[in-house]
Curated annotation (Swiss-Prot):
Catalysed reactions listed for this entry: Hydrolysis of DNA containing ring-opened 7-methylguanine residues, releasing 2,6-diamino-4-hydroxy-5-(N-methyl)formamidopyrimidine; 2'-deoxyribonucleotide-(2'-deoxyribose 5'-phosphate)-2'-deoxyribonucleotide-DNA = a 3'-end 2'-deoxyribonucleotide-(2,3-dehydro-2,3-deoxyribose 5'-phosphate)-DNA + a 5'-end 5'-phospho-2'-deoxyribonucleoside-DNA + H(+)
Catalytic residues (UniProt): P2 (schiff-base intermediate with dna), E3 (proton donor), K58 (proton donor), R281 (proton donor)
Gene: mutM
Designated name of the protein: Formamidopyrimidine-DNA glycosylase
Stated family: Belongs to the FPG family.
Quaternary structure (record): Monomer.
Record GO biological process: base-excision repair
Sorted UniProt keywords: DNA damage, DNA repair, DNA-binding, Glycosidase, Hydrolase, Lyase, Metal-binding, Multifunctional enzyme, Zinc, Zinc-finger
Length: 291
DNA sequence: AATAGCCCCTGACCGC
DNA sequence: TGCGGTCAGGGGCTAT
């Protein structure tokens, strides 16, 4: 599924079922997702209480009473279902409907809350890993991640520094998780549109010679925070709508201004939204508005 | 070191 | 209906 807003929505949806509850039983229905699951994966989870459920970039991090951390990534198609006494929910449903195919239910947590938390992932680009909390700084998946775009540390000056001297495109730079963590293809397109910046522009143009932020960097920083904030809000509200009508699309897609809107009118200038391929991935933009 | 491209995998959709 | 090609929210690895 996910970029930052979807992962955050999933986190909030899982919290009531997991946080503060013991994992009575963990079951892995196959020995690998994207990577092989550790041999002791289920054993290290069973009997542990989830003391907190956090997020870093597009990763979910469940703190366990044992001192381990359960790291979870949804890849492209991963989703969770929470099956409780009062029915079934899917936190973080988004642009594409989640898989209904039970053959892709790969991992199940039976919580002491009575809820079953099921991880489903048809493409298996997602993965899970358990490691000691003490290794959080050296964990390869987390090491080198850039700042959280909604965190206090992230500002135009940080973004400018990270992009200074970069010869690659602004689009590619923003997708690089070392520059800023949590953006994906959708929100990069949307943020660039809101900032009126071309995806083809060199990343280095966010900084001047002293590596100080240009106006572009200021605009882009604001656009990133704004679009992520709005998307998280929409994720929250689409959750409620969604309990009734399973199988429909999410909510924030209606707020897309350029993503997935090739050939449709630009909401700002009335021109036409264009699509082209950049580093192997679709970029959607309005050439008239974005310079 | 920085950058671009390939690849992992399944399913949906489109044109023939 | 069936078949092949294309595309999809990510990111690790490898070759320049």
């Amino acid at each position: 599924m996910p970029e930052l807003p979807e992962v955050e929505t999933v986190r909030r949806g899982l919290q009531p079922a997991m946080e503060g509850f013991r994992i009575d039983r963990a079951v892995a229905h196959r020995e690998n997702l994207r990577f092989p699951l550790q041999k002791d994966f289920a054993a290290r989870l069973t009997g542990q209480t989830v003391t907190g459920l956090g997020r870093r970039a597009k990763y979910l991090l469940a703190d366990l009473s044992s001192g381990d951390v359960l790291l979870m990534h949804l890849g492209m198609s991963g989703s969770f279902r929470v099956i409780g006494a009062d029915g079934e929910t899917t936190p973080g449903e988004f642009h594409y409907p989640r898989s209904e195919d039970r053959t892709h239910d790969h991992v199940v947590f039976e919580m002491a809350s009575g809820a079953r938390v099921v991880f489903n992932d048809p493409r298996r680009f997602g993965f899970m890993k358990v490691f000691p909390r003490s290794e959080i700084e050296t964990e390869p998946h987390l090491k080198g991640l850039g700042p959280e775009p909604l965190g206090n540390a992230f500002d135009a000056s940080l973004l400018a520094k990270a992009c200074a001297g970069k010869q690659t495109s602004l689009k590619a730079a923003l997708l690089d998780q070392r520059v800023v963590a949590g953006l994906g293809n959708i929100y990069v397109c949307e943020a660039l549109f809101r900032a009126h910046l071309s995806p083809k522009r060199k990343a280095s143009t966010l900084a001047n010679r002293k590596e100080e932020p240009t106006d572009h960097a200021v605009r882009l920083t604001e656009a990133i925070r704004e679009v992520l904030g709005e998307a998280i809000k929409a994720g929250g509200s689409s959750l409620r709508d969604h309990r009734q009508t399973s199988g429909e699309l999410g909510y924030f897609q209606h707020a897309f201004k350029v993503y997935d809107r090739e050939g449709k009118p630009c909401p700002t200038c009335g021109g036409t939204v264009q699509r082209f391929v950049q580093n192997g991935r679709s970029t959607f933009w309005c050439p008239k508005c974005q310079k």
